[in-house]
Amino acid sequence: SAGGISVPGPMGPSGPRGLPGPPGAPGPQGFQGPPGEPGEPGSGPMGPRGPPGPPGKNGDDGEAGKPGRPGERGPPGPQGARGLPGTAGLPGMKGHRGFSGLDGAKGDAGPAGPKGAPGQMGPRGPGERGRPGASGPAGARGNDGATGAAGPPGPTGPAGPPGFPGAVGAKGEAGPQGARGSEGPQGVRGEPGPPGPAGAAGPAGNPGADGQPGAKGANGAPGIAGAPGFPGARGPSGPQGPSGPPGPKGNSGEPGAPGSKAKGEPGPTGIQGPPGPAGEEGKRGARGEPGPTGLPGPGERGGPGSRGFPGADGVAGPKGPAGERGSPGPAGPKGSPGEAGRPGEAGLPGAKGLTGSPGSPGPDGKTGPPGPAGQDGRPGPPGPPGARGQAGVMGFPGPKGAAGEPGKAGERGVPGPPGAVGPAGKDGEAGAQGPPGPAGPAGERGEQGPAGPGFQGLPGPAGPPGEAGKPGEQGVPGDLGAPGPSGARGERGFPGERGVQGPPGPAGPRGSSQGAPGLQGMPGERGAAGLPGPKGDRGDAGPKGADGAPGKDGVRGLTGPIGPPGPAGAPGDKGESGPSGPAGPTGARGAPGDRGEPGPPGPAGFAGPPGADGQPGAKGEPGDAGAKGDAGPPGPAGPTGAPGPIGNLGAPGPKGARGSAGPPGATGFPGAAGRVGPPGPSGNAGPPGPPGPVGKEGGKGPRGETGPAGEVGPPGPPGPGEKGSPGADGPAGAPGTPGPQGISGQRGVVGLPGQRGERGFPGLPGPSGEPGKQGPSGSSGERGPPGPMGPPGLAGPPGESGREGPGAEGSPGRDGSPGPKGDRGETGPGPPGAPGAPGAPGPVGPAGKSGDRGETGPGPAGPAGPAGARGPAGPQGPRGDKGETGEQGDRGIKRGFSGLQGPAGPPGSPGEQGPSGASGPAGPRGPPGSAGSPGKDGLNGLPGPIGPPGPRGRTGDAGPVGPPGPPGPPGPPGPP
């Protein structure tokens, strides 16, 4: 050494591995501050849809809805059983003399004439319609067909326009204290510093006596940061040190600064999860109003009733002109019909007859095939913000975001309390074993002497480990030392005990610039099933579904009240014989004419999609047969009404009641079916005579030829009932208790990255960003080809002008088309730049967006917090369309069946209406039908659990090298 200056020699070998030190004393616990303002919502992408939650509990019985509208006219019902013969009516008055009768019947065919010469070939074309054949016997009911396969899914509807941004929500109530989060993910290991120059190996000296500890020297000036060195080999892991005891609870700290309430950008729509389990069967709905009477069924024709008393013969009218006799022979031309006679006047209406017994219900019809699924509706406007949901189970952490640029250095904070002792660091490599020194007695620590004038010598060889000294008392916490250099990252320790929930700190300054977003990560693992959320508000009514296919024939409903007479329709063609109207005065018995041919069937209506088959209901018990009631007295004869216009071709209605209604008799057993009587002889219609006794009902004549189809008459007036107003919503139920925590799901396989989605609609203009820092002028790149013209975006607010750059003014270039956004370039191979001068601290910016959530540690999830308060009820949505008809309610013991509605006859004298019969037993419920078309989009549901983390994003560009930190405090002396 020259002039007393020691020259450092080469660095010696590393010493042996040191023993783990004793656990440090626990530091005092920090003060718990008041809870801070709620932070702004995150802006990360919405995760995939979580697994379906457990089936919810059955809701309370809803209020009885408004009676539904009458359904579509059902298919023709089966022909009922033959009714019992009616009682003999009273003799009617003698009818008046009738008008001229119709043409006489066609004469018998004469003998066959000689065979004629072959005629000329007639024009080609369709021949006349032949007469319908006799009705065959009804076939046995076939088995129900198998349920058809579900139709293909309908095409996806067009995406709706972007919704308007919702209003800023009100400040939410402070939620319950959530469970402590698990340990965060292990950070990226920092690069080790460059190795120092190796000193010269000096001779191993004898261990000297323990010197007095020197005084703490002044902090040296920060040195120049060296170039980053290569990473060294990872050393072996040291033993885990024991955890220190928890410190005392500190006082409450100062309240944190309020967080920003700016609303985050909406994330993309998550992937639709698997369908949830089928819910439990709902409550039986209120019974709807009876539907209109169905068309007549295809059953067999009933037998004739009992023959009535013959009426008095009327005065014979003049005989009508005889028709032309047909030409003899099969090939002869058909004779032309004679002229039609004048129709007779309408007779007086007779008394109302007794009501016949109802027929037994027929078999159910088959279920129709399912209709095609409708197109998806367009999304509706955003609904009101829902109530705050309960705290869900801790989700998986999201993907790590791109590294941002370093922020401005903040002011030096107030020294905090010392933290808990951290895990032991990595052990260094074992050095050469030094010579063992003599074990001296453990001396007591002396007072600190003054600092010596010499420089710090080279470290001597490590001596043998001495005896552990007595643990000293805890000293007063000193001032916070300057931050030392970052050490190597230790092994990940075991999760410690759950600490006290600390107050949220104040929002930090926002970074000067935000890095470019990383690439979309692959979908992560599926998170555990969350707890079932509270019952949401009532959703908007869905759109009216398509009309369902006619379901199975249900039990006949009760006979509704007689509606008001409809307006007179246009005179139509002659239709088939309707049901017998009120008996008029008996006229002279005329000869029955030929029955007209039945008209062609009307056009079939549009087939709706199949309705949902109901669950089979319980079969009711048969009712007791009652005794037959006595016939009531005849009512007074009404005045003769003017002949009304011929009505449209109506469905055969029920048999009209005869005579005024007496007390209702019990339903008797169906009688045996009678045989069809032969047709009566053909006679001329006489004028109506005076009213005679009421005759018994004669047998029906043979079926005539089908007549031309009648025209459809005008629709009848609406019923007298008023449209009811929708019922008010019931009171909101109390929030349910949180369910038990679900078990953790198995770890899913990471799926492959999905295809890139189509470009969405242009978003709404975002808020103006802060002016960015002035960056260095980049080198001019080559001009790329013009990209395709994109759709015009919405005009955003004008941004603040940035500072003017130092570049020279260039020549004006041509306006190029905007090119597509290029991929992020790789980091260039250039050397790191020289450290820049420390910048002046900038103003505190707004609070930055919440960072991505860290990975979940191995610790168990904490207990679920208490349920949050239920939010206020949302606005009442529009009235929904009529829902599907609920299950058929249980019927009473007895009930009459309603007949088929026939065309209105001439007005008779109104009889007294008897009370309705008791309800009969319920029929079996039909099978469930296929689902109807989807309804409108409901309100936004509660947010689902946080999805699994995506893959790690690309590493951001390296930021500029910061200024070197001050040197750290000297370490504790090694063992003697």
UniProtKB/Swiss-Prot annotation:
Bias-annotated ranges (Basic and acidic residues): 58-72, 879-893
Biological process, per Gene Ontology: extracellular matrix organization
Expression sites (tissue/organ): Expressed in bones.
Annotated compartments: Secreted; Secreted, Extracellular space; Secreted, Extracellular space, Extracellular matrix
Keyword Transmembrane helix: no
PTM-bearing positions, type 5-hydroxylysine: 94, 249, 319, 544, 655, 821, 882, 894
Modified-residue entries (Phosphoserine), positions: 1, 100, 580
Disulfide bonds: none
Skewed-composition ranges (Low complexity): 108-118, 132-150, 198-237, 352-378, 387-406, 465-474, 577-591, 604-631, 660-676, 723-735, 864-878, 910-943
Biased composition (Gly residues): 294-308
Regions of compositional bias (Pro residues) in chain numbering: 152-164, 785-795, 829-844, 961-976
GO molecular function terms noted in the UniProt entry: extracellular matrix structural constituent conferring tensile strength
Modifications made to the protein after synthesis: Contains mostly 4-hydroxyproline. Proline residues at the third position of the tripeptide repeating unit (G-X-Y) are hydroxylated in some or all of the chains. Contains 3-hydroxyproline at a few sites. This modification occurs on the first proline residue in the sequence motif Gly-Pro-Hyp, where Hyp is 4-hydroxyproline.
Positions bearing 4-hydroxyproline: 20, 23, 26, 35, 38, 41, 55, 70, 76, 85, 91, 118, 132, 153, 162, 165, 192, 195, 207, 213, 222, 228, 231, 246, 255, 258, 266, 275, 290, 296, 304, 310, 328, 337, 343, 349, 358, 361, 370, 379, 385, 397, 406, 415, 418, 436, 453, 459, 465, 471, 477, 483, 495, 504, 517, 523, 532, 550, 565, 571, 592, 598, 601, 610, 616, 634, 643, 652, 664, 670, 679, 688, 691, 718, 726, 735, 753, 762, 765, 771, 786, 792, 798, 806, 812, 832, 835, 838, 907, 910, 928, 943, 949, 964, 967, 970, 973, 976
Domain of life: Eukaryota
3-hydroxyproline carried by residues: 678, 948, 963, 966, 969
Region described as Disordered: 1-976
Cellular component, GO, one term: extracellular space
Function, in words: Type I collagen is a member of group I collagen (fibrillar forming collagen).
Similarity comment text for this entry: Belongs to the fibrillar collagen family.
Subunit structure, interactors included: Trimers of one alpha 2(I) and two alpha 1(I) chains.
Alphabetized PANTHER family for the sequence: COLLAGEN ALPHA (PTHR24023), COLLAGEN TRIPLE HELIX REPEAT (PTHR24023:SF1082)
More details: These protein fragments were extracted from an ancient mandible bone collected in Haiti.
Protein name (Swiss-Prot/TrEMBL): Collagen alpha-1(I) chain
